[in-house]
């Protein structure tokens, strides 16, 4: 059995462990009594520990909050169902797989939609408990699964969707897959519950299981990993626990990776012990040591991360508690080798290349803008059907991007016309979409997310429409501002790496953050607190007017807000995120 390293000198070790640690210890390697709950017809949900345990299997219990009060008045439990998030490292999926997933979404999910996420995968919303094993068995048949896409594990591994640098992308994508596989849990609990559908009867069977990397109690908190290919930072690498920045050898081949750690975007309103932070540089490793580096960072976080207070359990807090130099030294000790110095790299933007792009291998790639990633047939558009019809004729693959868009990848010259015709006829290509809208993002929020405090996905289209009018008023329609709305401070919409970030505070009210940058390397500062969308638009009307009149050539809105002193930059988030007066420049490496 795995023996986790005993650590000393960490304040949290003197405090009681969180109940989640008990839950994991007693879960029989994540099986719990989920199978018993699946047989219970009296509720649409899961009871006790199982409510949490299903998250390790890639699901969350949710309900339709739009009708929650109505059902309560009728003495009914909430309309419970599950969200499922697939594991799809790098976001690549085959058209043949998509056709089967589309069929399941239409026939078995409450909302009859597929949601593309900013972690390069898809989600089903509204899957009833009775259909869960059917769903997982379908994924298994297609060579897919949902293990470790939620809870205290390494989540879906991102990889830059770069259709131009085809060979470098192929190499980086292969490492994204290898990292994902290497950091997966080893328990058979997922297969026992969802595919085989049987209990393991003997405790001796559990004694044969081991988690050599994650340990019996897995990680202290969620853990996010990305592989990024400069100069495009589409995966928002500074917002992850662990990042591998692919470095080219100058001839289009992979020379190795710069390794960064400690990014994360969640916080809690009013809790100054929580804060978003950008990831910090550890060093460079050649490709053959990438898995060793990944394992060393993960096991360091496993053993040193806070298991008492989950609000301070992410890797960024571990680095803050240990100090960056000590964290790096521990990782190097576990790697059995030192990092090499960081290799130079630079990001120039984050947005997807909407439309056709030709790769260096001669194949074409069509990036479709999907607002908030929602594929559904409604409102005069048949987006879900459109992708299905493309999947029926496409011989290449699909790539889900970290900007919630979809790439129809590897299209030969002769196949372009038919695919574009289908995309246009089903509303997947629509001329006149502003750059502002193309660079906007939202989380799901209402009606399904139980943590939502304010709307996000459902208000984004109209909010961007009003912001487009303001941009036109000030003569900036040909430009863009990275704008993101998230329904609560947990960070799913990545608003804490936006130039304009709205964070839900209460129904109809948001905190307005400004001052991030286009490249995604700076956290925006709180500008106005607990205000309505009309009030936010009024504030932005004034600020965008100033930006239009006084900006330097090529200067983004966020950079302008910092240069002119509208807000102070967040330079050292643990110190100055909540108190701008403490903003003092520090060395990041």
Swiss-Prot record:
Pathway: Sulfur metabolism; hydrogen sulfide biosynthesis; hydrogen sulfide from sulfite (NADPH route): step 1/1. Its EC number is 1.8.1.2. It catalyses: hydrogen sulfide + 3 NADP(+) + 3 H2O = sulfite + 3 NADPH + 4 H(+). Coiled coil: none annotated. GO terms for biological process: cysteine biosynthetic process; hydrogen sulfide biosynthetic process; sulfate assimilation. Its cofactor is siroheme; [4Fe-4S] cluster. Siroheme binds at residue 492. It is an enzyme of class 1 (oxidoreductase). Binds 1 siroheme per subunit. Binds 1 [4Fe-4S] cluster per subunit. [4Fe-4S] cluster binds at residues 443, 449, 488, 492. One of its GO terms (molecular function) is NADP binding. GO terms for cellular component: sulfite reductase complex (NADPH). HAMAP family: CysI. Alpha(8)-beta(8). The alpha component is a flavoprotein, the beta component is a hemoprotein. Component of the sulfite reductase complex that catalyzes the 6-electron reduction of sulfite to sulfide. This is one of several activities required for the biosynthesis of L-cysteine from sulfate. Belongs to the nitrite and sulfite reductase 4Fe-4S domain family. This is Sulfite reductase [NADPH] hemoprotein beta-component. It comes from Neisseria meningitidis serogroup A / serotype 4A (strain DSM 15465 / Z2491).
């Amino acid at each position: 059995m795995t023996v986790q390293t005993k650590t000393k000198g960490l304040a949290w070790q003197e405090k009681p462990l969180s109940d989640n640690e008990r839950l994991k210890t007693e879960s029989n390697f994540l099986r719990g009594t989920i199978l018993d709950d699946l047989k219970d017809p009296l509720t649409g949900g899961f009871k006790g520990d199982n409510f949490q345990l299903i998250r390790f299997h890639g699901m969350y219990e949710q309900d339709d909050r739009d009708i929650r009060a109505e059902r309560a008045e009728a003495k009914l439990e909430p309309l419970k169902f599950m969200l499922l998030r697939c594991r799809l490292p790098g976001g690549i999926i085959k058209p043949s797989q998509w056709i089967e997933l589309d069929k399941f979404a239409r026939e078995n999910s409450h909302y009859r939609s597929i949601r593309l996420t900013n972690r390069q995968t898809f989600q089903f919303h509204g899957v009833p408990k009775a259909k869960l094993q059917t769903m997982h068995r379908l994924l298994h048949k297609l060579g897919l699964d949902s293990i470790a896409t939620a809870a205290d594990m390494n989540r879906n591994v991102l990889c830059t969707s770069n259709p131009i640098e085809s060979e470098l992308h192929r190499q980086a994508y292969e490492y994204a897959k290898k990292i994902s596989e290497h950091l997966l849990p080893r328990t058979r609990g997922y297969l026992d519950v969802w595919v085989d559908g049987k209990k393991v009867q003997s405790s001796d069977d559990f004694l044969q299981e081991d988690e050599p990397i994650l340990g019996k109690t897995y990680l202290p908190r969620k853990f996010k990993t990305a592989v990024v290919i400069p100069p495009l930072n589409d995966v928002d690498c500074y917002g992850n626990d662990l990042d591998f920045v692919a470095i080219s050898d100058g001839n289009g081949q992979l020379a190795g990776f710069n390794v960064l750690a400690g990014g994360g975007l969640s916080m809690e309103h009013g809790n100054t012990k929580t804060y978003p932070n950008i990831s910090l540089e550890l060093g460079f490793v050649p490709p053959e040591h990438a898995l060793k580096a990944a394992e060393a960072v993960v096991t360091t976080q496993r053993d040193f991360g806070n298991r008492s207070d989950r609000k301070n359990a992410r890797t960024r807090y571990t680095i803050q508690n240990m100090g960056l130099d000590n964290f790096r030294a521990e990782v190097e000790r576990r790697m059995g080798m030192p990092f090499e110095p960081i290799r130079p790299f630079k990001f120039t933007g984050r947005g997807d290349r909407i439309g056709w792009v030709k790769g260096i291998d001669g194949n074409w790639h069509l990036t479709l803008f999907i607002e908030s990633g929602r594929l559904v047939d409604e409102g005069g558009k048949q987006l879900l059907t459109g992708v299905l019809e493309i999947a029926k004729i496409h011989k290449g693959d699909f790539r889900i991007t970290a900007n919630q868009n979809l790439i129809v990848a590897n299209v030969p010259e002769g196949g372009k016309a038919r695919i574009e015709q289908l995309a246009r006829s089903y509303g997947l290509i629509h001329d006149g979409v502003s750059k502002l809208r193309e660079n906007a993002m939202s989380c799901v929020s209402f009606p399904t997310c139980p943590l939502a405090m304010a709307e996000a996905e459902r208000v984004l289209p109209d909010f961007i429409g009003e912001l487009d009018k303001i941009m036109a008023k000030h003569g900036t329609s040909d430009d863009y501002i990275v704008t993101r709305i998230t329904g609560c401070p947990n960070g799913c919409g990545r608003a804490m790496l936006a130039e304009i970030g709205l964070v839900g505070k209460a129904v109809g009210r948001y905190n307005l953050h400004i001052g991030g940058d286009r490249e995604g390397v700076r956290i925006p500062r709180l500008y106005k607190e607990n205000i309505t969308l009309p009030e936010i638009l009024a504030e932005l009307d004034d600020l965008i007017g100033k930006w239009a009149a006084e900006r330097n050539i090529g200067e983004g809105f966020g950079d302008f807000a910092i240069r002119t002193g509208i807000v102070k930059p967040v330079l050292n988030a643990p110190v100055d995120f909540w108190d701008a007066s403490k903003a003092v420049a520090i060395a990041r490496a």
